[in-house]
From Swiss-Prot:
The gene is HNRNPUL1. Keywords: Activator, Isopeptide bond, Methylation, Nucleus, Phosphoprotein, Repeat, Repressor, Ribonucleoprotein, RNA-binding, Transcription, Transcription regulation, Ubl conjugation. Its methylation is enhanced in the late phase of adenoviral infection. This is Heterogeneous nuclear ribonucleoprotein U-like protein 1. Residues 668-693, 742-764, 784-795 have a biased composition (Low complexity). Acts as a basic transcriptional regulator. Represses basic transcription driven by several virus and cellular promoters. When associated with BRD7, activates transcription of glucocorticoid-responsive promoter in the absence of ligand-stimulation. Also plays a role in mRNA processing and transport. Binds avidly to poly(G) and poly(C) RNA homopolymers in vitro. SUPFAM superfamilies: Concanavalin A-like lectins/glucanases, P-loop containing nucleoside triphosphate hydrolases, SAP domain. The modification Asymmetric dimethylarginine is found at R639, R645, R656.
């Protein structure tokens, strides 16, 4: 694909298909797409060179995904069979002499838009490709609320955006306390993202007899290297708040066994706030196969953390020394201590003492498995595959890899194919009981090892010292929930590639969201679990949840969910639909009631082509707006909007009219309104009607008449500006059906409060205010011809004498000369609109009528 030849729309389409940001100029879009294309190259082109120094850390390839995107994983090459010794005991190189992570594309970790560079004390290098991806990536929440990226998790440099973009981001959304996880789930469901095509996870021909990190018994956001002895967590966006755990594939229940773990890197997470406690920490230890990945936070899960504390069942106690990057922790399990099992640890070869004593009877003969829980750290294990250990081992202990296979207990093996996997999609309103049912169902089916995909499960992995982050969290709670929702969207995309069993714990009331979320899981056993309690039970559960967790979902969001609630049906994307409480018939009736309730309480449907305003200045916000399809703007808008500048037909009040093809307002038929530019019922200055009129051939004007011997007495001033009987401008045209051929003046009266533009009374057809116009210059050759438009036939006109009661000083000749210049300029300006004025012959104007002569 030649990125340079793609158009902007094509670039955005390609970026959207890959789940990348589609905002920016064409150059930025092209750079972003080029980076994504390079990231899709095979792994053998993206690995480190084989001549890397032994012991030097290689690249950590992290994935680059945006919301709605898919995980870009390459093809994993199987490691050579058997155990391969490393080049150096203290090195961090893989079996091939270099460290190549699990065919995963790089993860964007930074939000710095000026200097996108990771500071790495351990020497982890980043190639230009990663920098291009980091520069191309902009965190965003493209939602119906149009809410921008949160800034509280960004470094100060991230706010230094380009000026041309920053000026459009000055308006801030109001902060609402009641935006919890349910609200952001609802907002995501409203979004109409295109589903990503399902992708198969490449199979590895890994030797299953080796002790290694179990890719089935680890978190989805823990990335395992191809040699299965090292790994690291995702750290972009909200993932930096999450713990990420993994267990080994084999456990033990007898003997004296050990393994080692080394912290290779504390991954930079500059986007975390400075108030985040312990942004880099590792917890290492043992657990049962039935335990979750949250080491040390439940029974039979024992861990020793880098904060110098040991923990089990979320009880933390001081133990040993703190440890950090480049430290090596040895883990020892002694099953030969009578009726107890003793667990102890070493730091860099120094024994920390016995940490836990467990009764064998309590274990019930179950095996303990090596377990690690990390937060923004890359780690590597030594299960015995290395020729030499990192540090000295306590006497009498054996690496778990060196035990006979018969003495090792294999952990739970995952499904062999996607046909054996289940995806259960919860469907129900907030507080209906979806999470409660999911937890109970997973606990009652431990062999399936359900992965619950929900914001609540994400928040459980953000614990601090084993405690959930509550609303007294130092930062913005709604922003943290928003980050968790982003993580969930990414995990759903990753989950579609992994052969596991899942429970999708979200509302999923939108039919479009149901289809979109199930399509990537093609090949799974896709089932919908509908929880629809009675309306009374739902209200009680909502009150209880609000008391426990606070207001989670705004009322308007719940009403919108009710209005769009769609019960799923067995079809293309669902194999089975189960109703937990109300069954199908009762649920259908209740959902129809919810639909009606939501539609009545919700706002009216949005109209894409609507004119809502009337009366804005010069029509920028009034007179109908920028609408090509409807002319519903009420009269009164000043100048109207595009294609509707004339306002209502014949209505008064529109200033200067506009270009109205419908003929509304003034200047209709004969272009001047009802033959009188100052007519009461026409718009002041009217609107220009483009519609050509079928007119007879223009007639030759009669010869000019001699002026009257005596001018009329000067009129007097009146607040009405145009007093009754005052002479007004009348441009006559030979138009069938009009009164243009009669020279009867019409009276124009404007009240002072009306925002109209009236001028001192004068007759543009003949200045009859008591002066003799100078001889006009010869008119230029006509430059415009309206074709079928009727020509002007200014008939001789003698204005009637004004009322005697109206007297005011005689206007001077200079005033009339100034008016003449203004009108001449006015008609010259009309020539700047050839699309609207065609080839009309305006003639020249210099103290006389257009095409006629002045009279007195």
């Amino acid at each position: 694909m030649d990125v340079r030849r793609l158009k902007v729309n094509e670039l955005r389409e390609e970026l959207q298909r890959r789940g990348l940001d589609t905002r920016g100029l064409k150059a930025e879009l092209a750079e972003r797409l080029q980076a994504a294309l390079e990231a899709e190259e095979p792994d053998d082109e993206r690995e480190l060179d084989a001549d890397d120094e032994p012991g030097r850390p290689g690249h950590i390839n992290e994935e680059v995904e945006t919301e709605g995107g898919s995980e870009l994983e390459g093809t994993a090459q199987p490691p050579p069979p058997g155990l391969q010794p490393h080049a150096e005991p203290g090195g961090y190189s893989g079996p091939d002499g270099h460290y190549a992570m699990d065919n995963i594309t790089r993860q964007n970790q930074f939000y710095d838009t000026q200097v996108i560079k990771q500071e790495n004390e351990s020497g982890y290098e980043r190639r230009p490709l990663e920098m291009e991806q980091q520069q191309a990536y902009r965190p965003e929440m493209k939602t119906e609320m149009k809410q921008g990226a949160p800034t509280s998790f960004l470094p100060p440099e991230a706010s230094q955006l380009k000026p041309d973009r920053q000026q459009f981001q000055s308006r801030k959304r109001p902060y609402e306390e009641n935006r919890g996880r349910g609200y952001f789930e609802h907002r995501e469901d409203r979004r109409g993202r295109s589903p990503q095509p399902p992708a198969e996870e490449d199979e590895d021909d890994f030797d299953d007899t080796l002790v290694a990190i179990d890719t089935y018994n680890c978190d989805l956001h823990f990335k395992v290297a191809r040699d299965r002895s090292s790994g690291y967590p995702l750290t972009i966006e909200g993932f930096a708040y999450l713990w990420s755990g993994a267990r080994a594939s084999y456990g033990v229940r007898r003997g004296r066994v050990c393994f080692e773990m080394k912290i290779n890197e504390e991954i930079s997470v500059k986007h975390l706030p400075s108030t985040e406690p312990d942004p880099h920490v590792v917890r290492i230890g043992w657990s049962l196969d039935s335990c979750s990945t949250q080491l040390g936070e439940e029974p039979f899960s024992y861990g020793y953390g880098g904060t110098g504390k040991k923990s089990t069942n979320s009880r933390f106690e001081n133990y040993g020394d703190k440890f950090a990057e480049n430290d090596v922790i040895g883990c020892f399990a002694d099953f030969e201590c009578g009726n107890d099992v003793e667990l102890s640890f070493t730091k860099n070869g120094k024994w920390m003492g016995i940490a836990f004593r467990i009764q064998k009877e309590a274990l019930g003969g179950q095996a303990l498995y090596p377990h690690v829980l990390v937060k923004n750290c890359a780690v590597e294990f030594n299960f015995g595959q290395r020729a030499e250990p990192y540090c000295s081992v306590l006497p009498g202990f054996t690496f778990i890899q060196h035990l006979p296979l018969s003495e090792r207990i294999r952990g739970t093996v995952g499904p062999k194919s996607k046909a054996e996997c289940e995806i259960l999609m919860m469907v129900g309103l907030p507080a209906a009981g979806k999470t409660t049912w999911a937890i109970k169902h997973a606990a009652s089916n431990p062999s399936k090892k359900y992965n619950i995909l929900g914001t609540n499960a994400i928040m459980d992995k953000m614990r601090v010292m084993g405690l959930r982050r509550q609303r007294n969290y130092a930062g913005r709670w709604d922003v943290l929930i928003q980050q968790a929702t982003q993580c969930l969207n990414r995990l759903i995309q990753i989950a579609a590639r992994k052969k596991r069993n899942y429970i999708l714990d979200q509302t999923n009331v939108y039919g479009s969201a149901q289809r979109r979320k199930m399509r990537p899981f093609e090949g799974f056993q896709r089932k919908a679990i509908v929880i629809c309690p009675t309306d009374e039970d739902l209200k009680d559960r909502t009150i209880k949840r609000t008391d426990e967790e606070g207001k989670d979902v705004p009322d308007h969001a719940v009403l919108e969910m009710k209005a769009n609630f769609t019960l799923p049906d067995v079809g293309d994307f669902l194999d089975e639909v189960l109703f937990i409480e109300l069954q199908r018939e009762e649920a259908d009736k209740l959902v129809r009631q919810y639909n009606e309730e939501g539609r009545k309480a919700g706002p009216p449907p949005e109209k894409r082509f609507d004119n809502r305003g009337g009366g804005g200045f010069r029509g920028r916000g009034g007179g109908g707006g920028f609408q090509r399809y409807e002319n519903r703007g009420p009269p009164g808008g000043n100048r109207g909007g595009f294609q509707n500048r004339g306002g209502g037909s014949g209505g008064g009040g529109n200033y200067r009219g506009g270009f109205n093809r419908s003929g509304g307002g003034g200047y209709s038929q004969n272009r001047w309104g009802n033959n009188n530019r100052d007519n009461n019922n026409s718009n002041n200055r009217g609107s220009y009607n483009r519609a050509p009129q079928q007119q007879p051939p223009p007639q030759q004007p009669p010869p000019p008449q001699p002026p009257p011997q005596q001018p009329p007495p000067p009129p007097s001033y009146s607040p009405a500006r145009n007093p009754p009987g005052a002479s007004t401008y009348n441009k006559n045209s030979n138009i069938p059906g009009s009164s243009a051929n009669t020279s009867t003046p019409t009276v124009s009266s404007y009240s002072p409060p009306q925002p109209s533009y009236s001028q001192p009374p004068y007759n543009q057809g003949g200045y009859s205010q008591g002066y003799t116009a100078p001889p006009p210059p010869p008119p230029p050759p006509p430059a415009y011809n309206y074709g079928s438009y009727g020509g002007y036939n200014p008939a001789p006109y003698t204005p009637p004498p004004p009322p005697t009661a109206q007297t005011y000083p005689q206007p001077s000749y200079n005033q009339y000369q100034q008016y003449a210049q203004q009108w001449n300029q006015y008609y010259q300006n009309q020539g700047q609109w050839p699309p609207y004025y065609g080839n009309y012959d305006y003639g020249s104007y210099s103290g006389n009528t257009q095409g006629g002569t002045s009279t007195q």
